[in-house]
Amino acid sequence: MAALQPVRGTHDYLPDEARSHRHVEETARTVAERFGFGEIITPIFEFTDVFARTLGDTSDVVTKEMYTFTDRSGDSLTLRPENTAGVARAFISGGLAQNVPVKLFYRGPMFRHERPQKGRLRQFHQVGVELIGAENPLADVEVIALGSQLLGALGVGGRTILHLNSLGDPESREAYRAALVSYLSGHRDSLSRDSLERLERNPLRVLDSKDEGDRAVVAGAPRLIDHLNEASRAFFAGVTGGLEALGIPFEIDPLLVRGLDYYGHTAFEFVTTDLGAQGTVMAGGRYDGLIRQMGGSQTPGVGWAAGVERLSMLMAADRVGAPRPLAMIPAGPDDEVEALKLAHALRQGGLFVDFGYSGNLGKRMKRANRINARAAIILGGEERANGTVVVRDLDSGEQETIGLAVLEEFLARFL
């Protein structure tokens, strides 16, 4: 029955996947806090104008992928396809401009109506950071360094490569736009319909096309990095010099552009070859005009977002395992309440303790093995009378009788 299946492009995260998912999020939060970033939580839907004004009316996100609906009040609302615009809106409405620079971390679901495939869902999850209010290129370096440290903390840093490019300032992009239009106009017959439309409205988007014919044309296109003015070159040199000083390796990718209109100057991606077509696991850049475009004062910003699902897939070989619990086993029905009390006390002490609710001693032991328990704590009438329990090591099969007064200390060996 179709109604019993998840909606196309969505996914149920059962315990093992959910554990890996949360591990990515919590690791990201920990690393972000190490860099001085505080968590921000924004709504999963915004007024449609928040995205339509900022992402660009020629972007695939706005023209093809947004989940937009009209609510009962007649307002046009959109499930967030990304969160930089939402964070920027919160920066303005929350009055955070008084305290720049502001460092913000976020996590949560995003929504895009894309063709579902491995590593690409219609409801997906991201972690991300935004550093708002710093125009120094070292802010870009710090944001990239945070991303690099996160990948390292997840154990996948050695399987990713940092790609870097400069989109320059508006003056540089305008000079490049003229050169690019001239080149692409000579290859109209080879461009896809989408790219022909982009050529008229926003030619830089042609560089981001995934169409094979477009890619062949783009391979011979002039490079934006060759059209940077002196100020843009100096800014980019500050970024590359900072990365070199921190020992963060990178590759210059002259065709790298961001798919959203608000980016300028630094653009970057951490890419892997281990996930096939969905090789970008983290992407970001600088957006100095976004806050003003949304109605705030001129305020620079830089940030990135990373796909939780893709990072989790990349970590699959090193899947985060569940803590092996201890199994609390009452020997019989008369021992259940006391066993539950003991389990409760051990949990309050920080131990992972499972308690089964039915079955004789043999069936409860089978359950302990099925859940991969590290040890079984057996409590019967004799043990209750003596203030002891029997602790059985389920790996070795050895068991000992232990007094309750020293039980927590004894169980520490199984952690």
From Swiss-Prot:
ATP-binding listed as a keyword: yes
Cell location: Cytoplasm
EC supergroup of this enzyme: ligase
Enzyme Commission no: 6.1.1.21
HAMAP family: His_tRNA_synth
Highest taxon, organism lineage: Bacteria
Chief place where the protein resides: cytoplasm
Oligomer status and interactors: Homodimer.
Protein family according to the UniProt entry: Belongs to the class-II aminoacyl-tRNA synthetase family.
SUPFAM superfamilies noted in UniProt: Class II aaRS ABD-related, Class II aaRS and biotin synthetases
Keywords: Aminoacyl-tRNA synthetase, ATP-binding, Cytoplasm, Ligase, Nucleotide-binding, Protein biosynthesis
A GO biological process held by the record: histidyl-tRNA aminoacylation
The protein's name: Histidine--tRNA ligase
Species name: Rhodospirillum rubrum (strain ATCC 11170 / ATH 1.1.1 / DSM 467 / LMG 4362 / NCIMB 8255 / S1)
This protein's GO CC annotations: cytoplasm
Catalytic activity annotation: tRNA(His) + L-histidine + ATP = L-histidyl-tRNA(His) + AMP + diphosphate + H(+)
GO molecular function, one term: histidine-tRNA ligase activity
